[in-house]
């Protein structure tokens, strides 16, 4: 496969107004995507966004480019990323487009695409779009231009979809749940789903102003929801990220339950009910404790590259359904075509009710190995992973840990970061060797 010029592991992402995330580029991207999609069926796409203020500007630019290529557009407004995947299928669209930078700050934004079946766009289609980007932009004839319409009932459709993934014989009545929507795209969705299923809902992170998405709230900033769960004596907490494709949970003691533990709980419930297809897929970053816990249950476990698109690819290759990442991307292909934070949370709630256990009790089935993750920022053009001192530091750590741990060093697919991960059966060793490697990376970048 050719190297990608614009698309990263999760679409196109960057700082608003710079490089790729500006009106001119995004209009051209819309046109190029329209050229690739044109003539393939309905000539219709849908566009949704999170709550960043730049979403309005980028939505208009995409709309203009797509229209120039003869594509009709359905505008969803603020909607979770998994909702756009689902609605792409239900509206029989050629593609769904998401304007979001997920868990990043408000000044970043991005564009990613879903195919007609609600899955991430294939690599060859992304490459075809990139090829069109290098051609001069030309409008179709005036009578062939696309039109845009606002879709009024999108939120209600998705709320019903979420509720449909919760067993009809179960109820959340009697449960007190804190839900943190990160001032993001789920702010008008998740509280309604939980309350309509019977829960008492306490909301935080549900007042977006265009600038506060992911700011000290949500799945990447857990203090707010931990404090709220304890303050309100809630049974558990849901923490979603800005676009709703990942979730972290909090038990009634205030312990954070991460994506690896969520995958374990969902897989265990599926196994107990006879619905587990084969095994489970994690990534090279998944905690060794997940692999050990699943092995105890007799469940096979495979690791993919980091990124939910690669988890999805391996699930499809294996014919399995359940997988995810520690960061809270959780997939269950029996329920949704992509990672869905709300649906994953509902599946954990169903597992609790089926087992008549608290979240804390369920999570004890998996013992996490101490894992230290350090992110080191690097400048464009630097190649710290090629530095001999960095390579030597990794070899030293691997030699010292032996079979008691593992080391992973990788470049982020979405940000200029080197991710240093060390896992060991002893927390002190994990921290010591992660710091050792991170120091070598910092020196290699001139820090």
Swiss-Prot record:
SUPFAM superfamilies: Phosphoglucomutase, C-terminal domain (SSF55957), Phosphoglucomutase, first 3 domains (SSF53738)
One GO cellular component, as annotated: cytosol
UniProt-annotated binding residues for Mg(2+): 102, 241, 243, 245
Top-level taxonomic group: Bacteria
UniProt keyword annotations, A-Z: Isomerase, Magnesium, Metal-binding, Phosphoprotein
Post-translational modification: Activated by phosphorylation.
Pfam families, alphabetized: PGM_PMM_I (PF02878), PGM_PMM_II (PF02879), PGM_PMM_III (PF02880), PGM_PMM_IV (PF00408)
InterPro entries: A-D-PHexomutase_a/b/a-I, A-D-PHexomutase_a/b/a-I/II/III, A-D-PHexomutase_a/b/a-II, A-D-PHexomutase_a/b/a-III, A-D-PHexomutase_C, A-D-PHexomutase_C_sf, A-D-PHexomutase_CS, Alpha-D-phosphohexomutase_SF
CDD domains in the record: GlmM (cd05802)
Phosphoserine modified-residue sites: 102
Catalytic site: 102 (phosphoserine intermediate)
GO molecular-function terms, A-Z: magnesium ion binding; phosphoglucosamine mutase activity; phosphomannomutase activity
Cofactors, names only: Mg(2+)
Keyword Magnesium among record annotations: yes
A biological process term (GO) from this entry: peptidoglycan biosynthetic process
Cofactor: binding details: Binds 1 Mg(2+) ion per subunit.
Enzyme nomenclature, EC number: 5.4.2.10
Catalytically driven reaction(s): alpha-D-glucosamine 1-phosphate = D-glucosamine 6-phosphate
Coiled coil residues, start to end: none
Function of the protein: Catalyzes the conversion of glucosamine-6-phosphate to glucosamine-1-phosphate.
UniProt family annotation: Belongs to the phosphohexose mutase family.
Record's protein name: Phosphoglucosamine mutase
Protein species of origin: Pseudoalteromonas atlantica (strain T6c / ATCC BAA-1087)
């Amino acid at each position: 496969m050719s190297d990608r010029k614009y698309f990263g592991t999760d679409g196109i992402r960057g700082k608003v107004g710079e490089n790729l995330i500006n009106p001119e580029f995004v209009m051209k991207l819309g046109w190029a995507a329209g050229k690739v999609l044109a003539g393939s069926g309905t000539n219709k796409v849908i566009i949704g966004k999170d709550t960043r203020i730049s979403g309005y500007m980028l939505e208009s630019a995409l709309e203009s480019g797509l229209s120039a290529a003869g594509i009709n557009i359905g505008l969803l407004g603020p909607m979770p990323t998994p909702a756009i995947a689902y609605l792409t299928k239900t509206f029989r669209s050629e593609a769904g487009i998401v304007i979001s930078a997920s868990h990043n700050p408000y000044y970043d934004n991005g564009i990613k695409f879903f195919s007609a079946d609600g899955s991430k766009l294939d690599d060859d289609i992304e490459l075809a779009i990139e090829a069109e980007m290098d051609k001069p932009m030309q409008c179709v004839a005036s009578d062939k231009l696309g039109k845009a319409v606002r879709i009024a009932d999108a939120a209600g459709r998705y709320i019903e979809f979420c509720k449909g993934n919760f067993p009809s014989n179960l109820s959340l009545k009697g449960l007190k749940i804190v839900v943190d929507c990160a001032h993001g795209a789920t702010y008008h969705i998740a509280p309604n789903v939980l309350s309509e299923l019977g829960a008492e809902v306490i909301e935080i992170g549900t007042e977006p102003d265009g600038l506060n998405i992911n700011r000290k709230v949500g799945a990447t900033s857990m203090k707010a929801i931990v404090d709220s769960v304890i303050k309100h004596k809630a049974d558990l907490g849901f923490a979603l990220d800005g676009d709703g494709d990942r979730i972290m949970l909090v038990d009634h003691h205030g312990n954070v339950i991460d994506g690896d533990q969520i995958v374990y709980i969902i897989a265990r419930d599926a196994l107990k009910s006879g619905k587990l297809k084969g095994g489970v897929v994690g990534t090279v970053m998944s905690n060794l404790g997940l692999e050990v816990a699943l092995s105890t249950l007799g469940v096979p476990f495979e690791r993919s590259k980091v990124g939910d698109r690669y988890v999805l690819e391996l699930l499809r290759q294996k014919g399995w359904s359940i997988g995810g990442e520690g960061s809270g991307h959780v997939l269950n292909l029996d329920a949704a075509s992509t990672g869905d934070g709300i649906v994953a949370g509902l599946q954990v709630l169903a597992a609790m009710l089926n087992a008549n256990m608290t979240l804390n009790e369920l999570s004890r089935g998996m013992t996490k190995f101490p894992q230290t993750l350090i992110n080191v920022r690097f400048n464009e053009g630097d190649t710290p992973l090629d530095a001999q001192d960095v390579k030597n530091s990794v070899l030293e750590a691997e030699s010292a840990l032996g079979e008691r741990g593992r080391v992973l060093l990788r470049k982020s697919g979405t940000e200029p970061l080197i991710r240093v991960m060390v896992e060991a059966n002893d927390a002190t060793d994990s921290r010591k060797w992660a710091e050792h490697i991170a120091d070598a990376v910092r020196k290699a970048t001139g820090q």
